[in-house]
Amino acid sequence: MHREDSLRTLGLVAASLLCMCISGAAALPNPGEHGGHDRRDDRRGFTSGGTLTATQLRQLVAQMTLAEKVSMIHGAPEGTACNSNPASGPVFPVISPSFAGCAGQAGYNNGVPRLGIPPLRQTDGPAGIRLGHEATALPAPVGLAATFDRSAARDFGTVMGREGRAINQDVLYAPMINLVTVATAGRNFETLGEDAFLMGQIVSDEVRGIQREGLIATLKHFAMNDFENARMQTNIAIDEQTLQELELPAFEHGVRAGAGAIMCAYSRVNDVYSCSNDLLLNQVLRRQFGFTGWVLSDFGATHRLTDLIYGLDSAMPQGNNAGLRDEPDPGNLREPPGVGAPGTGRTLTSAVISGSPAVPVFNDWPAVPAFTGAQWQAALDDAVFHILTSMNRVGLLEGTPFGSHDTGGAPFLLPRPDLASLKPADFKIAQDIAEESATLLKNEHQALPLRHGDFHGAGVLVVGPTSVTPYVGGGGSAHVIPFDEVPSPFEALVAGAGRGAGVRYVPGYDLDGELVPPAAIGAPADSAFAGQHGWLRTQISTVLPANGAAPDPCSAACAADQLDPSVDYAATTLPAATAWRWQGTFTAPSAGTWQLKIFAAHQSNAQLFVDGLATNPNRRINLGLYASGGGGFGTSNLASWHGLVQTAKSHDPSSARFQQGGFTVTFAAGETHTLDLRAYADPSAPLQVRFEWVTPDWQVRSIAAAVQAARTATKAVIFVYDEGTEGSDRGGNDQAVGLRLPGYQDALIAAVAAVNHHTIVVLNAGDPVVMPWAGDVEAILQMWYPGQRGGPATANVLLGNTSPGGKLPISIPDDPSHISTFSPDCNPAVISSSPPNDGNCPLYPGAFEPGFISGDHSYKTIDFVTNGIFRGYRWHDHVGVEPLFPFGHGLSYTQFRYSDLDIDDSRGGGIEVSFVVRNIGRDGGAEVPQIYLGSPSNPPIGTDFALRKLVGFARVDLKPGQATRVKVRIDRRELSYWSVAQHDWVVAEGSRALYIGASSRDIRLRGQARIGR
């Protein structure tokens, strides 16, 4: 009995879940249950598809021992031979906690050597191959979405696919396809915007690009990992229509495109964890979408052994499932702590042999029925079959007895490309996409492009440190170590402007700060160094305390307390696998805002407390929930919680090994504050850490220098940024703060624009930011996080070598209150361990940081109540709020005219829309006409419809005076709505308006279509 059938028989669908009886009416092509996959057909003749059938895959499962099956579904951090080339070195490494000598990959699953099944080596994405190894740092995926270009998406995936294989990886944790729902979500830059249709179109081609190179693409995070704060403690309360129409379509598109794997999310959906959610994993993913591939958990996203029964295939590291760790559950479904090595699966093995008992309701943990050994065996066999199916799709099973290259136990792997040989082509793709993504938001008086005359006289002034310190990408799982030197926008602009051109640079904003002087810090009054200047340094336990509690003291081989004049460790003084605490007091000499800067490398975690969590919960900073990766190059999750503002996190220009976290805090004159910094060294390398700041006086002087230079400049180009990262949302718990540019960048822009009326702002942002200065500057160019070729790409756009053609995949509000998750009643200061909805923040539960207080704490913590189908531009239309810049907006250096609309609604339930677009300007450029469908004149009762929704688009490049007829097919699926009554897609019949425009608000043509069955 297969798992899907066993669930139907057992009737395990909880009554609290939405009933979704799928009739299979989806119009998208279904890959079917076949182990093979479409083969690649290109000029190189490379074939990625495997030859095994589903029957042969089942037979291969039958040949495996119980121990081999259990081993295969247990994920681990990395294997000891992860850097070995399968053609010449070890292929089947044992699982090891050591990262020494490895590529810094994210995950690892064992193979079966005797059957020729290789292990699976797994890398993070989704903006390039994220390892402790160099790769091409691509533009952020939100920038890819801004291209509205399917072919660019295919190229984007191709780069990751071939580079991943070149670095001996088999699985890529990408694309990320969670909607931009919360405007300040830390990982918005990793995803593809706020619109489900656009996301589905882009992800389909990205997946094809990845998998045709022989790398398994992993769609993540299934489902609704739409923000970072409290992502592990959030329940998503979502209705059936919204789930089907907004959250699931991109995953369906990715499945239809052949994605080999799905990563289930941390959150719960309608009270059930995503990684044990029968509705999502079995009813939707398996039966509705026809997915036969591999479902793996996010790291730490599993909770019970029964996750395997309910649809999970593989538990990745840090999870409670499959006997990996204890859980708050009295049932005997777990492996006792300390018994067996990670991944031995002792409890699962016992369940397969003897079955498992029923477990009653435990607090808010639901009851679990008893399962027989046969049911566990069927679930385990299904899980292994799904993993093998994914491997077969990219040709990883050709060395098995059923493969085309059976070698009697040795694996056969397709040739891997040489990484160095890929650089020229991949760099070009990276730069092309960065240029295509360039989104011109404003351009009064044709301020851009910069012209030859602008560089005469005082010339062009460039302001902002990210013009000289290239802003490559965001943090967390998406951080990529770029190949080679990364050219900056400033040096590319100087080179492009030509010899003798006037281009000056003034920082204006301090990205790095200065070392805190010893005289500014006093030792704690209760220490042996009371009355002296400096920091009390104490060695502490390496066990991270929960919820900001005081750390335990060091218990063995401890260093004596020391008085450090400053926190400045860049050598080997702080050994690997140790933990340290620095405490001191600071009295503000004057009122103002202070930028606190933390640099760290080789840290597994770091925390900074201002005035102590117990004294003031709003003064806590958490720096290192996301550990630094191999060699210290990985990104720390430098997060700010509870009101301290994250102002910067980038590479320290003096050392690529350091990561920087910066925070803004306001002090009154004469106030004394306590500072408490804790840092935990990575197990593999000595800790390096430095504490710096930017004082209020220094900020004033920085702005004044920029203003003085701007007075005489022909034009001022200001580079500003925000940063997203995994594990925290921008602004901590305060969305209004998170929507602003960090630090004093807003003040810098306002001051420069006040003295130079030809000010241009270049944004490196991964999501919406409010722009109080938008009316004071002439031009605004959004370059997103442009990757390692972002410098030349930015210069080309500024100089007019490339005309911007990007369109916003997100809406930009004019005020923090004009976002769908804003609530005037939300009170983030109300911190409680027993919500839901304490503080009246149901639209943004990330306002809290609840934790599991003890093992018997309820798993229900906070609820996220969605706005139904009204997100992004749909919400703005629904409530009648005008955004600052609408979804789909983007200007060009030329102009386009739309005309001659024709609508053919007689094509078998679909619609073909055609119209003419003409370039009426004097420059060549790209335009993205967009097609929006209006709501039906007589909508079904109980069903919501957007005022208009995106149903089609095309990107066209036109020379001056050139015209083209654009034809866009609108499928029947896009004319349908999800019927809660029928639990299926139903065409909304009758007359529907069609809007063709340059954005969701800039409508150029209108028409009507008669839609029938």
Question: Whereabouts are the PLM-identified features?
Answer:
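Glycoside hydrolase catalytic-domain context in secreted enzymes
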Residues: 27-978, 984-1001
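Fungal secretory targeting signals
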Residues: 1-28
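Short beta-strand elements
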Residues: 1002-1013
